[in-house]
Amino acid sequence: MLISQRPTLTEEVIADNRSKFVIEPLEPGFGYTLGNSLRRTLLSSIPGAAVTSIRIDGVLHEFTTVPGVKEDVTDIILNLKGLVVSSEEDEPVTMYVRKQGPGAVTAGDIVPPAGVTVNNPDLHIATLNDKGKLEIELVVERGRGYVPAVQNKASGAEIGRIPVDSIYSPVLKVTYKVEATRVEQRTDFDRLVLDVETKNSITARDALASAGKTLVELFGLARELNVEAEGIEIGPSPAEADHIASFGLPIEDLDLTVRSYNCLKREGVHTVGELVGRTESDLLDIRNFGQKSIDEVKVKLHSLGLALKDSPASFDPTTVAGYDAATGTWSDTDAGSFGDAEGTEDYAETEQL
């Protein structure tokens, strides 16, 4: 956390479907960041259930009437859009309304299957006269947000199947405000007040918990960038990091013999990174730098997990004369290491004279 005091969340229940939540303290500016994210998620991304299509007995399309029914089909569909249902099923389910007049048809007349609940049974659907009769088949599905009727139209639907606009979101209204709050001696921290009103299919508390879970899952993608996102390797691995660090080492740290060190310095090679950028041919072009010196450099670089630009990956230091497998080091009995003796700068291997 950015501050030492962990934010707290409290709930004030205003009604069965409405609560006010307070989150504090938050770093300055985070009240709006969190409030806007939660509000947008609550209004658009909370899963719910809704009617996606209907079929009315004796009706072929929505621009008609039903004998004995006061409302036309369009009005009936508009009324059904206000139906609040909850479903535990992932697959579409079917509900039925069968009513004989006279009287009103309400959502309480709907017969839902197991796992489906009608949460506003008082919703008015239609009005029947003495001869009125209404039979409706309703398909209910789960989803998120709002889906227009044109998208609910199935390609192989039977004649008389009427698609309906689906309002899946169980959240009716969300408002928030940010106030100042005090933490120790500072008074510029944020206090987020979130007012959530839902339909009867879910409580405000459950809606906020669902929104928080959705945001955590999405923000988790960014959090994984600190380790490794799927399909993307972010930053060097530990081994690569060691190699990168080794490139900046001065060649003095390689503990080369005096002749090898002096030859490289005269050539302008000062770091390990500059050395690994050379090939064996490049080094042989250096005056007084012979094969023995190249073998020494290759062994020293191998101890760091590095190699010359053209060195084969299969290089085996044990094949080099002077290599001690027990200690993993190379020594030249004919010449001391850098700093062991004076006056050796002009020492040269005979094959390079």
Swiss-Prot record:
SUPFAM superfamilies: C-terminal domain of RNA polymerase alpha subunit, Insert subdomain of RNA polymerase alpha subunit, RBP11-like subunits of RNA polymerase. Its EC number is 2.7.7.6. Keywords: DNA-directed RNA polymerase, Nucleotidyltransferase, Transcription, Transferase. GO terms for molecular function: DNA binding; DNA-directed RNA polymerase activity; protein dimerization activity. It comes from the Bacteria. Residues 241-353 are annotated as: Alpha C-terminal domain (alpha-CTD). Residues 326-353 are annotated as: Disordered. Residues 1-226 are annotated as: Alpha N-terminal domain (alpha-NTD). It holds the Pfam family RNA_pol_A_bac. Residues 342-353 have a biased composition (Acidic residues). InterPro entries: DNA-dir_RNA_pol_insert, DNA-dir_RNA_pol_RpoA/D/Rpb3, DNA-dir_RpoA, RBP11-like, RNAP_asu_C, RNApol_insert_sf. SMART domains: RPOLD. It catalyses: RNA(n) + a ribonucleoside 5'-triphosphate = RNA(n+1) + diphosphate. One of its GO terms (biological process) is DNA-templated transcription. Belongs to the RNA polymerase alpha chain family. DNA-dependent RNA polymerase catalyzes the transcription of DNA into RNA using the four ribonucleoside triphosphates as substrates. HAMAP family: RNApol_bact_RpoA. The N-terminal domain is essential for RNAP assembly and basal transcription, whereas the C-terminal domain is involved in interaction with transcriptional regulators and with upstream promoter elements. Homodimer. The RNAP catalytic core consists of 2 alpha, 1 beta, 1 beta' and 1 omega subunit. When a sigma factor is associated with the core the holoenzyme is formed, which can initiate transcription. This is DNA-directed RNA polymerase subunit alpha. It comes from Rhodococcus jostii (strain RHA1). The gene is rpoA.
